């Protein structure tokens, strides 16, 4: 627990010269820490300008196997030269995720505000979605009703069709990457292992090989399986997600 406390930024920490304030940690994985926070902004109207606080989430790149913070310091440090190479490589991956998401505006996909670098690492400021993941709902309540699952699958299917039309594959569709918002709609998150393709439908961006067992398609187990654009991997993973929600 003490190690975790050293790894994340303290509650109340300010980023971007006070533009964002972090309130608390909401999640942590191998490559990043996600914080709940607020965005201090201004809303202009006919009666003038009003300062307001907008709830957001901030994803910080933190490669936990190689990174650390010294007590009392906000700067991210890396243990070794080998670690620095990997750290910089995957930092670009995080920035790529943000740039892809910033170009994708769809009612069933999380919105990104901006990406920036600070404290020797990178951050993505994004829309805060009040709700729970399908993974959490499944673990808490058991299998979902068929009509509910069908609704969510249709919504994520629409989101995937939208990104596929832009020659982007998500490549990590699973219950933990689908949030249900306060209006009861499914929202697709985490484009960290996504790939972009050019007009010839050939891969133009590469990411580390990350497979979610039980949800990854056969193509993803082949190093060349996703070099040419095809929506099949995402469709397979969406089908596996539907099966999981109805049977597990």
Stretch-by-stretch model annotation:
Residues 115:
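Activation-segment/catalytic-loop signature of the eukaryotic protein kinase fold
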Residues 152-153:
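Activation segment signature within eukaryotic-like protein kinase domains
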Residues 119-133, 137:
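Conserved short submotifs of the Hanks-type protein kinase catalytic core
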Residues 72-103:
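AlphaC helix of the eukaryotic protein kinase fold
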Residues 204-220:
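Conserved activation segment of eukaryotic-like protein kinases, specifically the C-terminal portion
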Residues 158-168:
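Protein kinase catalytic-loop region centered on the HRD/HxD motif
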């Amino acid at each position: 627990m003490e190690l975790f406390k050293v790894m994340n930024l303290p509650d109340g920490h300010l980023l971007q010269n006070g533009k964002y304030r972090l309130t608390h940690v909401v999640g942590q994985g191998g490559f990043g820490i996600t914080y709940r926070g607020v965005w201090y902004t201004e809303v202009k109207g006919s009666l003038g300008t009003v300062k307001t606080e907008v709830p957001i989430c901030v994803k910080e790149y933190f490669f936990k196997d190689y990174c650390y913070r010294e007590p009392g310091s906000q700067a991210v440090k890396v243990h070794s030269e080998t670690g620095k190479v990997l750290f910089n490589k995957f930092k670009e991956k995080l920035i790529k995720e943000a740039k892809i998401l910033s170009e994708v505006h769809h009612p069933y996909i999380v919105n990104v505000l901006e990406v920036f670098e600070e404290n020797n690492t990178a951050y993505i400021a994004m829309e805060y979605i009040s709700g729970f993941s399908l993974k959490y709902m499944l673990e808490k309540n058991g299998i979902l009703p068929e009509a509910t699952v069908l609704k969510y699958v249709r919504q994520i299917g629409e989101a995937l069709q939208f990104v596929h039309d832009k020659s982007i594959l998500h490549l990590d569709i699973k219950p933990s990457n689908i949030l249900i918002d306060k209006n009861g709609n499914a929202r697709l998150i985490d484009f960290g292992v996504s790939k972009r393709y050019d007009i010839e439908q050939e891969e133009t961006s590469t990411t580390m090989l990350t497979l979610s067992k039980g949800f990854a398609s056969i193509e993803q187990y082949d190093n060349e399986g996703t070099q040419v654009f095809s929506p099949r991997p995402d469709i397979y993973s969406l089908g596996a997600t539907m099966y999981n929600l109805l049977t597990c």
